[in-house]
Amino acid sequence: MARRPRTIGPSAADPGFSPQHALELVRSAIPPVHPAGRPFVGAGLALALAGRRHRWLRRAGLLAAGACAGFFRHPPRVPPTRPGAIVAPADGEICVIDVATPPAELSMGDVALPRVSIFLSLLDAHVQRAPVSGEVIDVQHRPGRFGSADLAAASTENERTSLRIRTPGGAEVVAVQVAGLLARRIICDAHVGDKLSIGDTYGLIRFGSRLDTYLPAGAQPLVTVGQRAIAGETVLAELP
């Protein structure tokens, strides 16, 4: 009779198995929560605790905590290593590929640049990541409306925060966080002078939004409208 092959790796009978290893497995399977989401998750858990004697209230609190943990998830990403890649700064669906003038508050002139826009639904991870490695040379916030982020007018009329990054080679890429119908809070943790590596997390938009990426002149988008983008991994274009 053939013997069952020995399981490779830690197990309950293996000296390598430990609570620490089990914890690492859980951490690898469940993405951590972005710090901006912890108060929301905590509020849901507090509601569940306060209503522990009432099933409906307890369930509502746990459901709210779980939903917020999912919305504010901060999954690990592995950026491409090939030089010159410009990656998606957000998860979501490519909704627009065109040419447009960068936000006026960045004072980059009236020259239209290639633009790739990503729409983030409520089910997407809402952290933003640096599209390239380089130095932050400008950050500008402009108040505005809170219209639906999937409309063409959202890029010009909605509240937004623009991040301008200059690569070591001198090329510039702009990522614009655009507020949406439910997104009433834009968080940008990057400041002028910061050095970012491609794929670094720099911000977050709460509850549905849009991300516009302005590419250097001459860059050709490598994605198509309707394609799903993964922040920090999907290559939008290459530096010219």
Curated annotation (Swiss-Prot):
Cofactor(s) annotated in UniProt: pyruvate
Q: Which organism is it from?
A: Mycolicibacterium paratuberculosis (strain ATCC BAA-968 / K-10)
What Enzyme Commission number(s) apply to this enzyme? 4.1.1.65
Q: Which residues are catalytic?
A: 209 (schiff-base intermediate with substrate)
Which GO MF terms does the UniProt record name?
Answer: phosphatidylserine decarboxylase activity
Q: Could you say which residues form the signal peptide?
A: none
Name of the molecule in the record = Phosphatidylserine decarboxylase proenzyme
Q: Name one GO cellular component term.
A: plasma membrane
The record describes how the cofactor is bound as: Binds 1 pyruvoyl group covalently per subunit.
Chemical reaction(s) catalysed:
a 1,2-diacyl-sn-glycero-3-phospho-L-serine + H(+) = a 1,2-diacyl-sn-glycero-3-phosphoethanolamine + CO2
The domain of life for this entry's organism is Bacteria
Q: What is its main location?
A: membrane
What is its subcellular localisation? Cell membrane
Q: Which family does it belong to?
A: Belongs to the phosphatidylserine decarboxylase family. PSD-A subfamily.
Pathway(s) the chain acts in: Phospholipid metabolism; phosphatidylethanolamine biosynthesis; phosphatidylethanolamine from CDP-diacylglycerol: step 2/2
Q: What does this protein do?
A: Catalyzes the formation of phosphatidylethanolamine (PtdEtn) from phosphatidylserine (PtdSer).
GO BP: phosphatidylethanolamine biosynthetic process
Which Pfam families does this entry report, sorted A to Z?
A: PS_Dcarbxylase (PF02666)
Tell me the residues on which Pyruvic acid (Ser) occurs: 209
